[in-house]
From Swiss-Prot:
Topology within the bilayer: Multi-pass membrane protein
Glycan-bearing residues: 29
InterPro entries: GPCR_Rhodpsn, GPCR_Rhodpsn_7TM, Melcrt_ACTH_rcpt, MSH_rcpt
Family membership noted in the UniProt record: Belongs to the G-protein coupled receptor 1 family.
Database matches in Gene3D superfamilies: Rhodopsin 7-helix transmembrane proteins
Subcellular location: Cell membrane
Entry's transmembrane regions: 38-63, 73-93, 119-140, 164-183, 192-211, 241-266, 280-300
Protein's organism: Allenopithecus nigroviridis
CDD domains according to UniProt: 7tmA_MC1R
Record topological domains on the Extracellular side: 1-37, 94-118, 184-191, 267-279
Name recorded for this polypeptide: Melanocyte-stimulating hormone receptor
Length: 317
């Protein structure tokens, strides 16, 4: 779990080019004086991870406690929270271990440290993949609930949801091991990027279609009650704003990391790309920020879940 300059080892394999030249530590004339490197203090990294950890633990606890929340939709939300929890927890663990090793407070053999680092990398990578998958699964679940409302409970059953969850977890672990083992192959990095773009397109298409259906429904109600057109327009603008925020946060938090992977393949030695590579820790911090925001978007908006969460917090006191 060594640190290269200011670069954390976490997913360090994804922060190296297929060649032996490292991205960090380049000469000043290679990146230029204009190159901006955003430093993420370890304290901030740990704080973000802790906030995400607490939030997602609360979501998992609330869903596990309330049997009314044991439905396919909340099953996906719970697994999303668990994935985000693992993303944050593995980042916190590696940061803490790295700091202890640097301070000399933790003595370990190089082989042990390397094995620990590999395990943490697999957990981090698999939880990131599963998080993206569950975001897509939630979008599909909501789409079916709107466009196939009468058949929803026969299409999306709890056993099917559990099988889908198991398949996502198994595939995420297997593919993460494959990606980390062959990280120096351009095809592997491109597969990760294509996977991210596929999830982005899937979510965008489904949510835009759902927004269009909601606007049509609102327009029909407005005509039925002979309301004025501005009311329908206001609903459409509100829905569009919500959709923009949802997809915007997803792209803002995940996009830079996958841009990083794309540039590793396209321009590993270019000065501009080398400058972007310096901000790898910032891209990881944005993913942790997404793990903080996910519960606010998908979980805490549920009145039933908030009520259960309140009971859990009161009982803990």
């Amino acid at each position: 779990m060594p640190v290269q300059g200011s670069q954390r080892r976490l997913l360090g394999s994804l922060n190296s080019t297929p060649t032996a030249t490292p991205h960090l530590g380049l000469a000043a004339n290679q990146t230029g004086a204009w190159c901006l490197e955003v430093s993420i203090p370890d304290g901030l990294f740990l704080s973000l991870g802790l906030v995400s950890l607490v939030e997602n633990v609360l979501v998992v606890t609330a869903i596990a406690k309330n049997r009314n929340l044991h439905s396919p939709m909340y099953c996906f939300i719970c697994c999303l929270a668990l994935s985000d929890l693992l993303v944050s927890g593995s980042n916190m663990l590696e940061t803490a271990v790295t700091l202890l090793l640097e301070a000399g407070a933790l003595a370990a053999r190089a082989a042990v440290v390397q094995q620990l680092d590999n395990v943490i990398d697999v957990i981090t990578c698999s939880s990131m993949l599963s998080s993206l998958c569950f975001l897509g699964a939630i979008a599909v679940d909501r789409y079916i609930s709107i466009f196939y409302a009468l058949r929803y409970h026969s299409i999306v059953t709890l056993p099917r949801a559990r099988r889908a969850v198991a398949a996502i977890w198994v595939a995420s672990v297997l593919f993460s091991m494959l990606f980390i083992a062959y990280y120096d192959h351009a095809a592997v990095l491109l597969c990760l990027v294509v996977f991210f773009l596929a999830m982005l397109v899937l979510m965008a298409v489904l949510y835009v279609h759902m927004l269009a259906r909601a606007c049509q429904h609102a327009q029909g109600i407005a005509r039925l009650h002979k309301r004025q057109r501005p009311a329908h327009q206001g609903f459409g603008l509100k829905g569009a704003a919500t959709l923009t925020i949802l997809l915007g946060i997803f792209f803002l938090c995940w996009g830079p990391f996958f841009l990083h992977l794309t540039l590793i393949v396209l321009c590993p030695q270019h000065p501009t790309c080398s400058c972007i590579f310096k901000n790898f820790n910032l891209f990881l911090a944005l993913i942790i920020c997404n793990a903080i925001i996910d519960p606010l978007i998908y979980a805490f908006r549920s009145q039933e879940l908030r009520r259960t969460l309140k009971e859990v917090l009161l009982c803990s006191w």
